[in-house]
Amino acid sequence: MSHSGDELNELEARQDPRLLRALDAVAPGTPLREGIDNIVHARSGGLILIADVEDVSFLFSGGIKLDIDYSPALLYQVAKMDGAIVLSADASKIAWANVQLMPDPTILSMETGTRHRTAERVSKQTKSIVIAISQRRDV
């Protein structure tokens, strides 16, 4: 099936740059995906915010400022703490760990889990990439 130039231009115009950036960041083979996969395999869950820290710090309550170079192993280690992990906008640094994110509670969310509801609200409020990784249980 071939597309005309106009159809391709229309498809490109409808693409959400934020979604494309998120997909690019978590694509298989990327360091971020490796770190996420480690958390998934450990079944521990996590909440990762990728943003310019200065733009989202108003949401922080507590936490530990790290400002260290990103590695999949370090992401996995800090995910063992209960709070959110904040990565720099380009995901090259682990800026903060064990952060409680406090988004606007009036932002509508259909999510039922606390982690996923927080992720949705933070993303809507800040237009940042937020990744919620479910904790797995053998039930």
Predicted regions and their residues:
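Divalent-cation
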Residues: 2-139
